[in-house]
Amino acid sequence: MDFQKEPGRIFAVQDGTLIAEITFPEQDGVAVFDHTFVDGSLRGRGVADQLVRAAVRQVRGRGGKARLVCSYARSWFANHPEEADLLER
């Protein structure tokens, strides 16, 4: 899937409609993973996983840390302990 990237946001639009998005605005130097959305037509295709991975790359690229508010992001990080060093302590 082709994602558009902005600071603190990665998303996909199809025919003018938002179909996938993760938001992780920076607060006090920490990326707050606060929302993940995938359109029902895309569920089960690994799109949310792709969004979190792209966000992780973006946060790592700027040397940041992450705080998890979004339940999907919490679950994703629990299943990917190799990324735990990114989490705010």
How does the language model describe each region?
Residues 17-25, 32:
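Conserved beta-strand in the GNAT
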Residues 8-19:
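Conserved beta-hairpin
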Residues 44-56:
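Conserved acetyl-CoA-binding loop-helix of GNAT-fold acetyltransferases
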Residues 36-43:
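A short, internal acetyl-CoA/4′-phosphopantetheine-binding micro-motif in the GNAT/acyltransferase core
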Residues 2-3:
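Short loop/turn motifs at secondary-structure junctions and domain boundaries
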Residues 54-89:
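C-terminal structural segments of small proteins and small subunits
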